[in-house]
Every structure is written in structure tokens, then in C-alpha cells.
């Protein structure tokens, strides 16, 4: 009789606490759904205890996109098929000859799609680390004048940089960045935008980090209340020369809005061009890329130059760490393309 009483007592308390948890979950769920940020969101979840007993659900039978949870499978595949020590490579080479410090050919940068090239996340692999090694490699050969072009060979992957089903209002933002054969700074730029003093006032650009070269900007954002948060959207597309941002930003403070660079290979090329000039290395030709030549209706065949630098990415285990920790879409898309070519 004593055992039966104890069993019933346990059931009573389990039922009591389950009801209490269920009530709290319901209140929290409804509160969450009333937030402005949840205006167009979908939510579905089901809660059970360790024994599988039902506690609470909100549209528990509704199917939703699995979204970033799929990254777990991509990460597992990368470690299994490519290995934790796998590294991407970026190479710098040249064509022609060097005579008395003058290079008669082209300077070429090529890669097998390294998504970490120029990333800010890894110690020893930041933009300046790559740039310094490029300059050191060129100066070690005594080159101070380049007679040809600076070519960014991004032909390793195809010219379609994003999947066909991505929404238009995603691809201009940082999480919608495409994948090129040569990526740079995670194909992301950051705009520091100052909200006005009052609701409805215009906003102003204060600083753009990794400013996309040759891109014309249209800013139609306006100021909203102090606690409204970032409700802006950037509209641009791969290879576009126009970017448009609208929506609202909070008043009285600076907001950092991150977007996707429309043409990372050309962005890297133009940065490198300025880097060469700032280091007293003259270049007579122009900056171009494999994809840019295709856009211009010209043919491009990868040039076999003389290598002067092989630059390695962090190992795959470190790439996967940031892929999972920050859910970097660029990494996932690059890994899938890499599987298609190497596995």
C-alpha cells in the first residue's frame, strides 16, 4: 500500500509540474509571437519529457523548412570526406619574363574556392596576412613594374554563384553571399549607418568597411523609434553594379548593416591593385577576372604561370568550427561545391 501511495504521489507531482511548465511555455510562446520581429514568422514545436510524455505543442504537426540544422550534415560530410586537415589553397603566379625588375606578363591570383580567404575570424589568416605575403613574394623577385594585367582567376567554380531558389530579399544581405572560385573577406561588407534624430528622418552612411568597388548606392532607409532595431534590407545581385537599401533603422544611434559583395573577385583585384601601388609596384595593365571576361563576351583559358606563392587556408576542423558556431552560409555552399569537384 505504501508503494502504491508513493507511486500515485509521484504521478501527481509530475502532472502538476507538467501543467505548470505547459502553462509557462504557452505564455512564453504567445509573448514571442507578439514581438514585431515575428510578424511574418512561422513557428512549430513539440515538447515531451524524458519518458516521451506530452507536455506542450504549438502547431506541432506543421512541417517547416529545416533551415540551418541541415548544416550539421554538411559539416559531418566535410570532416568525413575531405578530412579535418584539408586546406584550401590560393596561388599567385605570373606569365612572361622578369628583366631588371620589370615583369613583361600578367600577375595571376587563383584559388580552389577558399571561403576563408581574407576572413577576420582566424588568427594569422586575416586580410593583411595574405596581402603582406603577396607583396613579400613579389618583392623577393625584385619586381617593381608589371607590364601586363592583374587577373583574378575565379574559374574553379562555375559562373552561377547562388542557387536558383534563393529569395530576392536575401541575396543582397550578408547571409545571401554567393560562392566564387575566388572569395574575399567572406564576400561581405559592413555599412555603418546613422539614424536621424526623429522618426521619419533620413539616414546617412558614415563608413563602409570592405566597400564594394564600382557599386552605385541608392539609400532609401528612414529613421524609426529607438527600440525598433534594424529593419533594413539590401537589394543587389551577383555581378551587379547597383545596390539599393530600404527599410528603417533606429533613431539616435549607429547601426551596422552587413551585405553581400556583388563581385568578390573584382573586389580583391581592385584592392590588390591599390596595394601594389602603395608598395611602389607599378602595374600598366588593368584588373580583370575570369568571370568578368565571360561577362564581356571574351573567352578565358586558365593561364599556367610560374608560382611565387601558395597560400593555405586554416584546416577543415577550424573551418567547420566557425561554420557551426556562426552558421556561415558561404561556408556551407562552398563545401557542397567542393564535394562536387573533389569527392
Label every model-predicted segment.
Residues 46-50, 60-61, 67-69, 95, ...:
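Acidic/polar N-terminal loop/beta-strand segments that form early-domain functional surfaces
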Residues 21, 25, 66, 70, ...:
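Hydrophobic (often cysteine-bearing) scaffold residues that line and stabilize catalytic clefts
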Residues 1-23:
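Bacterial Sec-dependent N-terminal signal peptides
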Residues 57-77, 81:
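Short active-site loop at a secondary-structure junction
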Residues 27, 32, 81-343:
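Conserved serine DD-peptidase/penicillin-binding transpeptidase domain
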Residues 19-51, 56-62, 89, 136-142:
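Beta-lactamase-like hydrolase cores
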Residues 3, 64-72, 262-266:
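Short, conserved micro-motifs enriched in small and acidic residues
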Amino acid at each position: 500500500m505504501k508503494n502504491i501511495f508513493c507511486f500515485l504521489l509521484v504521478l501527481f507531482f509530475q502532472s502538476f509540474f507538467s501543467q505548470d511548465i505547459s502553462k509557462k511555455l504557452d505564455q512564453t510562446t504567445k509573448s514571442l509571437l507578439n514581438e514585431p520581429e515575428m510578424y511574418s514568422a512561422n513557428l512549430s514545436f513539440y515538447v515531451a519529457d524524458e519518458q516521451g510524455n506530452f507536455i506542450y505543442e504549438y502547431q506541432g504537426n506543421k512541417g517547416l523548412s529545416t533551415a540551418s540544422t541541415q548544416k550539421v550534415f554538411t559539416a559531418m560530410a566535410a570532416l568525413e570526406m575531405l578530412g579535418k586537415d584539408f586546406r584550401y589553397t590560393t596561388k599567385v603566379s605570373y606569365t612572361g619574363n622578369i628583366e631588371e625588375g620589370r615583369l613583361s606578363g600578367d600577375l595571376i591570383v587563383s584559388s580552389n574556392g577558399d571561403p576563408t580567404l581574407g576572413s577576420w575570424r582566424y588568427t594569422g589568416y586575416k586580410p593583411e596576412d595574405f596581402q603582406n605575403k603577396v607583396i613579400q613574394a613579389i618583392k623577393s623577385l625584385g619586381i617593381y613594374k608589371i607590364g601586363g594585367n592583374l587577373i583574378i582567376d575565379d574559374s574553379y567554380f562555375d559562373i552561377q554563384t547562388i542557387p536558383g531558389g534563393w529569395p530576392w530579399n536575401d541575396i543582397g544581405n550578408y547571409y545571401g553571399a554567393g560562392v566564387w572560385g575566388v572569395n574575399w573577406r567572406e564576400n561581405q561588407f559592413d555599412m555603418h549607418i546613422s539614424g536621424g534624430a526623429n522618426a521619419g528622418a533620413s539616414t546617412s552612411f558614415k563608413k563602409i568597411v570592405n566597400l564594394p568597388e564600382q557599386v552605385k548606392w541608392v539609400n532609401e532607409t528612414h529613421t524609426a523609434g529607438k527600440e525598433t532595431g534594424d529593419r533594413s534590407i539590401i537589394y543587389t545581385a551577383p555581378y551587379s553594379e547597383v545596390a539599393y537599401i530600404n527599410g528603417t533603422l533606429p533613431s539616435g544611434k549607429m547601426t551596422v548593416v552587413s551585405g553581400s559583395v556583388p563581385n568578390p573577385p573584382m573586389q580583391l583585384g581592385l584592392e590588390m591593385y591599390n596595394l601594389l601601388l602603395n608598395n611602389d609596384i607599378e602595374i600598366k595593365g588593368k584588373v580583370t577576372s575570369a568571370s568578368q571576361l565571360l561577362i564581356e563576351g571574351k573567352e578565358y583559358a586558365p593561364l599556367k604561370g610560374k608560382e611565387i606563392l601558395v597560400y593555405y587556408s586554416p584546416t577543415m576542423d577550424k573551418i567547420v568550427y566557425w561554420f557551426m558556431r556562426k552558421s556561415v552560409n558561404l561556408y556551407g555552399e562552398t563545401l557542397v561545391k567542393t564535394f562536387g569537384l573533389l569527392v
